[in-house]
Amino acid sequence: MLYQQISQNKRRTVILLFAFFVLLVVIGAAAGYLLADSYQLGAAFALIIGAIYAFSMIFQSTSLVMGMNKAKEITVNDAPDFFHIVEDMALVAQIPMPKVFIIDDPSLNAFATGSSPQNAAVAATTGLLKVMNREELEAVIGHEVSHIRNYDIRISTIAVALASAVTLISSIGGRMMWYSGGRRRDDDRNDNGFGAIMLIFSILSLILAPLAASLVQLAISRQREYLADASSVELTRNPEGMIRALQKLSNSQPMTHPVDDASAALYINEPRKKEKLSALFSTHPPIEDRIERLKHM
């Protein structure tokens, strides 16, 4: 059952990433049609922009992310129990030892970052280290180490980059279309019904694609959380530890310092005040759903 769930989550992520590339091509083609009367040119331009965004974000330094989240690097002497648990989980997962950081915050939270296992890092709050027992802390760190092993940070970064690229192209396309006047619209009105349909489709694509891209990005983030929960159980062989850890996380207060959208998606638990919004707009699946999935393993 465990391996079945892991495989299912991986398949869903592949489907969502494919949907992202389709969105990128559609928005590029729409912009190309409106601005240069060329679907191909627009689609190619969109893919190039998406690739540039993805590569530039993937190679951002770990220290930058940790600095944004006020995390301080530690050694084994600073927090031996925490350090050794990270060491043990990395050994079981067969990845290099990540750097270890602590965030001075009373909330219960943790996250991992790094574009590959070779330059990864794990951070936990002081609140988490204080409240969790050893089994629960192993489950949380197993979750974060699984993100590293599964290259989730890279996938999430690509998702953020593609969403940003879609939004950028939509913004540029929309502004240039209006600045260029009604030439494209007049041409289509003087053409035929098909041209008018394509004009409407292209304009709607420019308007709706950014929203669709954000929804796909958030869906990828939620799928990676489910996968990391299941992978943590695979590493620790202790589903009860993961369940108890999630139960404690559900009662955590928000982080005391501001957390930006990109960083929020990295944490094991939503670090900001939980708003009563649709699950579609959440970076994390409901903890109740995560616990329920673990119970059925």
UniProtKB/Swiss-Prot annotation:
Residue sites binding Zn(2+) per the record: 143, 147, 225
Active site: 144
UniProt GO MF annotations: metalloendopeptidase activity; zinc ion binding
Enzyme Commission code(s) on record: 3.4.24.-
Superkingdom of the source species: Bacteria
Protein's GO biological process: proteolysis
Segments traversing the membrane: 14-34, 39-59, 158-178, 193-213
Localisation: Cell membrane
Cellular component terms per the entry's GO annotation: plasma membrane
Major place of residence: membrane
Cofactor remark: Binds 1 zinc ion per subunit.
Keywords assigned: Cell membrane, Hydrolase, Membrane, Metal-binding, Metalloprotease, Protease, Transmembrane, Transmembrane helix, Zinc
Major enzyme class: hydrolase
Family: Belongs to the peptidase M48B family.
Record protein name field: Protease HtpX homolog
Primary gene name: htpX
